[in-house]
Amino acid sequence: MMTQTLLIELLTEELPPKALNNLGNHFAAAVAEGLEKAQLVDGAAEYTAYASPRRLAVQVKNVKAVQADQKIVKKGPAVANAVKDGAPTKALEGFARGAGAKIEDLTIVHDGKQDVYAYEYVQTGKLLGELLEDIINAAVKKLPIPKVMRWGSSTFTFVRPVHGLIVLHGGDIVNVSVLGLQSGNKTLGHRFLSDGEITIENADSYAEQMREQGKVVASFAERKAAIQTALEGQARRLNAAVAADEALLDEVTALVEWPVVLEAGFEEHFLAVPQECLILTMQQNQKYFPLLDQNGKLMNRFLLVSNLQTEDPSHIIQGNERVLRARLSDAEFFYKQDQKATLESRLPKLSGVVYHNKIGSQAERIERLQSIAAHIAKALGADAAAAERAARLAKADLVTEMVGEFPELQGTMGKYYARLDGETEEIAEAVEQHYQPRFAGDKLPESKIATAVALADKLETLVGIWGIGLIPTSDKDPYALRRSALGILRMLMQYGLDVNELIQTAFDSFPKGLLNEKTPSETADFMQARLAVLLQNDYPQDIVAAVLAKQPRRLDDVVAKLQAVASFKQLPEAAALAAANKRVQNLLKKADAELGVVNESLLQQDEEKALFAAAQGLQPKIAAAVAEGNFQTALSELASVKPQVDAFFDGVMVMAEDAAVKQNRLNLLNRLAEQMNAVADIALLGE
């Protein structure tokens, strides 16, 4: 059957830039899925998504003009129940009537179990035009649009008003109606650079015609690549590097249809303002690309992406420089104003900054942070007074002009203002770094002082918010407690601190009776659960479960234990020892009395005597290896007792009739279990 390329384009008003690429990809995928389900393509649809500020489009290869005819078999009642006394039963008559057939038209087929009556017929395939309207409308309804709008007198809704619809199969218009628009083959190009209406001659020529006649690079991916290449080329020419993330590049790509990268600049005196402020202003407010020199310092040059191409771009450059100058002047003003007051003098204002009405203001938080940070610093062997001072100043920049304008700079501006106030560099850095890690993969605080304040901040948040009942759910975590827990865990995996003790310290910093009394135990369990999630990114679930079953309170050796268990699992004896350990644990659950020391005089059989001797020899080796942090050696030592363990279970009845003998054998197994599980609960391996 002959196939051709299908093109669908929705011509819109300017689409939301941050959502554009996602909308384009979803629309294209939904159309392709609809064509596949309608069997208008063979196999998986081969398609290209297009998305620019004023259009969403999809181009699908090898689309049929008509569905293939299908043989349909409708199965009815069993032959045995369909005829009675030579006459059709009501069941058979009802089936024939429902199928639109006469009884003599029915055939008999086997359904895999029995013979049944069936009606077989050929369903003629539908034309593309009969199916496409529903496919497009379904694709539009599936789009991830949080808010829709109406336009004019239309009752239709979409993310933005839609003014044109192209539906072409090859060079032929497919007549459909979508969002109140009749399909055609005409569209508009660039708002300023094109000469008006463009007639798309063929579905295959869409991208080329849009580029040549419309001055529109319709492909989001192609525009993005072109912008990135141009930015990098301009930066190399200036011996600089572009300061930009993927999100900014995506947003700028969504704002232009014909990207032109231009170089501009600003006055050097603005560089006296902390570069983080200037970079944020350029990126966030103006969508510009700042440039950094070889030392990572901001230059007074930047790159912008224009949606216009002119012979003389100087007026575009000057206009953008003028707008940026006003923005940078504001930042400069805020910076100078903030320097008129020290961070210390700003602290009283924190009383008016409510953190949560149940646990007080930021000023009250500061009191708690100081005590927690000092406690942690002592445990780390760091300067407790410095940690307390850093915690005292940590939130002071929240009431500065600069942070009021750019909340993203909290901590960063605190660092600069602390330096200007004469605080030590260690304290200034701690003020900034106490927010770290802000997200998964973010760097950790560099010093012990900064770590103490960062831990204090996150612990106080976790314990306080949890304690007033704002516990994270599967879909809600407004105070980012999961993120706080992850940050705490990552820091504690570098330092040998007791996580439960730190949680209790944070809990004790709140007024008595303010928080739920179960908070320490509940948050400790929450931390264990988050630790499992974190570790399962790098280790199998059974290995993580084995290590965490010991409920480690110090996390600095957890990774070493995971690595040791992973190595142990590869030993030939591992599976048998894990099974034996599980058997031991099941037997110990049956103990009637408290387990104690082994009475050597009650050992009767050679197998239990041999196991006792092996356990005796094993104990000091494992204890020494664990004390030295050599967990792999501790686990590998277990392989040496496998013969004695096997012989014991083959030849000894643990639950002997003699109560004293039974208790003694359970005591022996308990001693063995302590050694087998010194590093991890190996019974969980393989589960």
Curated annotation (Swiss-Prot):
Cellular compartment(s): Cytoplasm
Annotated keywords: Aminoacyl-tRNA synthetase, ATP-binding, Cytoplasm, Ligase, Nucleotide-binding, Protein biosynthesis
Primary location group: cytoplasm
Reactions catalysed, as given in the entry: tRNA(Gly) + glycine + ATP = glycyl-tRNA(Gly) + AMP + diphosphate
Enzyme Commission number(s) of this protein: 6.1.1.14
A biological process from GO: glycyl-tRNA aminoacylation
SUPFAM superfamilies, sorted: HD-domain/PDEase-like
One GO molecular-function entry: glycine-tRNA ligase activity
Any one cellular-component term (Gene Ontology): cytosol
Quaternary organization: Tetramer of two alpha and two beta subunits.
Name the UniProt record assigns to this protein: Glycine--tRNA ligase beta subunit
Organism of derivation: Neisseria meningitidis serogroup A / serotype 4A (strain DSM 15465 / Z2491)
